[in-house]
């Protein structure tokens, strides 16, 4: 299975197989957005899920991720049916021994927030904006995702799969 991760300025952070990443977004939609993607955290479940985020959108992404982490910290992991969200126990990098959903997805929060920090630092230092997006981290697909024009990412309709799930 190909790995998916965060692609940003000076950053390639592997999150895990596509099923893990998809599970994260499905969990946000199911537990926090009442099944309606983008209704509460559009910067995460719409933009990060399938599009590119520009420098001006990173502050909102950071706030939303912190809010999701706080809400996930109140959801016990013992009632979380990972199989229902498409996760295979034999092919996952999720921290399945966590006590809460925040624990299970802690690597995701760290990787994405670190990428936001790197993007901010890169912009300050070089006055250049590199979009933050999700994509494959394995060659050769990584090369295609990094070089894919931003307008292709941003033209994905809400009902279409992101590139990393195709």
What role is predicted for each listed range?
Residues 1-166:
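Acidic (Asp/Glu-rich) sequence patches and key acidic residues
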């Amino acid at each position: 299975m190909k790995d998916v991760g965060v692609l940003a300025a000076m950053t390639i952070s592997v999150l895990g197989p596509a099923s893990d990443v998809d599970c994260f977004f499905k969990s946000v939609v199911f537990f926090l957005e009442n099944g309606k993607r983008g209704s509460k955290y559009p910067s995460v479940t719409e933009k990060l899920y399938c599009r590119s985020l520009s420098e001006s959108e990173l502050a909102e992404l950071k706030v939303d991720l912190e809010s999701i982490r706080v809400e996930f910290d109140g959801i016990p992991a013992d009632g979380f049916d990972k199989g229902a969200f498409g996760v295979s126990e034999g092919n996952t990098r999720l921290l399945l021994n966590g006590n809460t959903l925040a624990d299970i997805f802690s690597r995701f929060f760290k990787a994405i927030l670190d990428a936001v920090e790197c993007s901010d630092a890169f912009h300050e230092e070089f006055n250049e904006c590199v979009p933050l997006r999700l994509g494959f981290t394995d060659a050769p697909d990584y090369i295609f995702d990094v070089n894919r024009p931003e307008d292709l990412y941003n033209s994905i309709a809400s009902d279409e799969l992101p590139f990393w799930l195709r």
